[in-house]
Amino acid sequence: MVRIVRSCLQSMLKLVNSLIGMVGIAMILYAVWLIRQWQEQMGNLPFADSDHPVPWFIYSFLGLGAILCVVTCAGHIAAETVNGCCLYLYMGFIVLLTMVEGGVVADIFLNRDWKKDFPEDPSGAFHQFSKFIESNFKICKWIGLSIVCVQGLSVLIAMLLKALGPHPHRHYDSDDEYNVSTVALLQDARQPPPYVVGEPMYGAKPGAWTVRLMKGQTGER
């Protein structure tokens, strides 16, 4: 029963983790599109040295998308191995991302002048993004809340997997995870058969005098 529950939780964590990875890939693609737009307008890449201010919005989207993809890979490894260290590392990354995203989302939804909290973006992408949020406020609100809920669900599933522990046939972190019947069979297989050390038991050998008497009796007959 525990094995079935563990397998279901592993599949659920991989599924939820894949959704986080899809969000990261979408952010990277959007950042690449913004880089393309910047190159068409300015004639060079935003990473090249220039006199223009740093396009922080493009950098932020690209970096956050890459971080989400790395966290997704770590989550798949943690879900497959059910290793305690990997699960703790994965949960730590997700909690940090959730705190940052939750702070940004709360500032956008609760503060009417949230644009003033961000620096000026020379690429103009931040202005377009803010206009899109204002025109589709309800949709963006539910999308943001869904992303935060998915990340929270991934942390909950990871905690349940850590409580169940790894598969018994893969890892033995403690003596309690050993199967008693398996250990007994292994001990029987490795234990040599019992034997008794002592002098060999042979029949009494006839002496030379006895042999002569027997030969003499045979000759008389």
Curated annotation (Swiss-Prot):
Observed effect of gene inactivation: Slightly reduced efficiency of intracellular multiplication of tobamoviruses (e.g. crucifer strain TMV-Cg), characterized by a reduced amplification of TMV-related RNAs.
Pfam families (UniProt xref): Tetraspanin
Keywords: Membrane, Phosphoprotein, Transmembrane, Transmembrane helix, Vacuole
Tissue distribution: Expressed in rosette leaves.
Membrane topology: Multi-pass membrane protein
Transmembrane segments: 15-35, 54-74, 89-109, 141-161
Superkingdom in the source lineage: Eukaryota
Chain ranges on the Extracellular side, renumbered to this chain: 36-53, 110-140
Stretches of the chain found on the membrane's Cytoplasmic side: 1-14, 75-88, 162-221
Modified residues (Phosphoserine): S174
InterPro entries hit by this protein: Tetraspanin/Peripherin (IPR018499)
Any GO CC annotation of this UniProt entry: vacuolar membrane
Subcellular location: Membrane; Vacuole membrane
Function text: May be involved in the regulation of cell differentiation. Promotes intracellular multiplication of tobamoviruses, probably being a component of the replication complex.
Subunit text: Homodimer. Constituent of tobamovirus replication complex.
Entry similarity comment: Belongs to the tetraspanin (TM4SF) family.
UniProt protein name: Tetraspanin-19
Organism: Arabidopsis thaliana (Mouse-ear cress)
Organism lineage string: Eukaryota, Viridiplantae, Streptophyta, Embryophyta, Tracheophyta
The gene coding this protein: TOM2AH3
